[in-house]
């Protein structure tokens, strides 16, 4: 009976994790460059249940009862890198990537340390010093891993290969990087990614589209349907816990009075 309580509990923990992920997806449905997340479930290893020390089969004999599965556990959380839809902005520095790849960003943490992060969120602008930066103020890098600085008094044109022109002169080229295996990317915040040990870069085939933004790849209706399904599964496990709790209460407090 207590094992049934544990099985229901693990089911609730698993559904709570899925619910948190779906809720975060819905919260970021309007976030530029956001990639939705998902979660897999994994069952615990089956256990062979046996009956031992039973007078009916002899003290030294073991009788097999059957296979028991003690419930489910969280498998893994993953990111869906499917490309999102494009929204037209007509802003030169709003950039979207058509194809696989990421913009390279010089990120500075609270301790003042810098490293390179990668993102699909191309909502860029020029700061007061003329540097191309993200909404958070992080610097966009060129193909030489340098900050991109432009003349704020001149109009810019950005071509599909990421080259920036001012006065018909190429002044910089935006770096677009891709990776052989996205399993070696770790999410940092909502739209940044950082490579982990073993990550290998490769040539990106993405085109840079100026005047567009890639929106989140979250399908709101689909996420809502999944959320309802998860809620019902959670409630079912919750009712199992309540039922077993009531049964244990009867066994402990009422049967003993007879």
List each model region and its residues.
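Amphipathic alpha-helical polymerization modules
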Residues: 1-258
């Amino acid at each position: 009976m207590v094992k049934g309580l544990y099985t229901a509990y693990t089911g609730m923990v698993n559904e709570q994790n899925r619910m948190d992920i779906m809720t975060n997806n819905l919260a970021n449905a309007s976030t530029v460059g956001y990639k939705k997340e998902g979660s897999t479930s994994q069952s615990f290893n089956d256990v062979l249940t046996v009956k031992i020390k039973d007078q009916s089969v002899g003290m030294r004999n073991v009788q097999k009862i059957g296979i028991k599965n003690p419930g489910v556990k969280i498998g893994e959380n993953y990111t869906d890198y499917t490309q999102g839809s494009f929204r037209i902005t007509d802003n030169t520095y709003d950039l979207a990537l058509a194809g696989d790849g990421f913009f390279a960003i010089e990120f500075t943490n609270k301790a003042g340390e810098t490293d390179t992060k990668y993102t699909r969120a191309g909502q860029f602008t020029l700061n007061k010093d003329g540097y191309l930066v993200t909404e958070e103020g992080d610097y966009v890098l060129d193909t030489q891993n340098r900050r991109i600085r432009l003349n704020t008094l001149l109009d810019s044109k950005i071509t599909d290969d990421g080259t920036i022109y001012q006065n018909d002169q190429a002044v910089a080229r935006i770096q677009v990087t891709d990776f052989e295996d996205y399993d070696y990317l770790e999410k940092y915040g909502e739209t940044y990614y950082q490579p982990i040990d073993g990550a290998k870069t490769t040539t990106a085939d993405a085109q840079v589209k100026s005047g567009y933004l890639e929106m989140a790849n979250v399908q709101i209706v689909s996420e809502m349907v999944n959320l309802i399904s998860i809620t019902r599964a959670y409630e079912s496990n919750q009712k199992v816990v309540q039922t077993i709790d009531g049964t244990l209460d009867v066994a402990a407090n009422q049967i003993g009075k007879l």
